[in-house]
Amino acid sequence: WSSDVCSSDLGVDGTDGILSLLRDLDEETLVLCLFSGGGSALLPAPADGLTLADKQATTQQLLACGATIDEVNAVRKHLSRIKGGLLARHAYPARTVALALSDVIGDPLDTIASGPTHPDSTTFAYCMELVDRYGLRQSLPAPVLQRLEAGVKGEIPETPKKNDPCFSRATTHVIGNNSLSIAAAEKTA
């Protein structure tokens, strides 16, 4: 099961390729994205000072202690260069349109694929609350703990929030979800 929610080196290479395509875009550029369930694991871009192994160990520890996928994704966003609205920030000032296939109940846009083009409602402080709630302070990789603590102190910028200018040029649309899938199955059955 963990291979479905943990990332690989191929994902890092692919994500680096995406980020390189987003360099030096202008207002006339349209960035079209498609996200779906599993997108969080497929877009691993460890933040500066972190390795993929750091992120994998953190994800595995969170899952092993019973953290929800929303909690795991909150931490992932703060250990990433692309999640939690950061893809939209990298693409800015280009116009970004994301189409999402949601496997998340309620279709929260900041949760689908860890919300790479949507404002992040979580914070470094919340991530540290999770670390303490699940008793992971002693077992997480040191660079992960250092990054989260630095974020709480304001030494590292937060993930972009709803007032960030990049979101004036970014939209996300759910084009498929569990309800639509069930309705289609009922119609064809």
Question: Model-predicted segments: where are they?
Answer:
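Short, small-residue-biased leader/transition segments that mark boundaries at the very start
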Residues: 1-7
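Hydrophobic alpha-helical hairpins/lids featuring a short glycine-rich hinge
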Residues: 8-49
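Active-site glycine-rich loop that binds ribose-phosphate moieties when present
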Residues: 13-20, 53-57, 80-85
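A glycine- and small-aliphatic-rich helix-loop capping segment at beta-alpha/alpha-beta transitions
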Residues: 23, 46-57, 89-93, 118, ...
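Structural motif
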Residues: 23, 29-34, 40-41, 67-70, ...
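Short, acidic/small-residue loops that bind anionic groups at enzyme active sites
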Residues: 48-73
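A glycine/threonine-rich phosphate-anchoring loop and its flanking beta-alpha core
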Residues: 63, 69-137, 144-149
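Accessory alpha-helical/coil subdomains and C-terminal extensions
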Residues: 94-97, 119-189
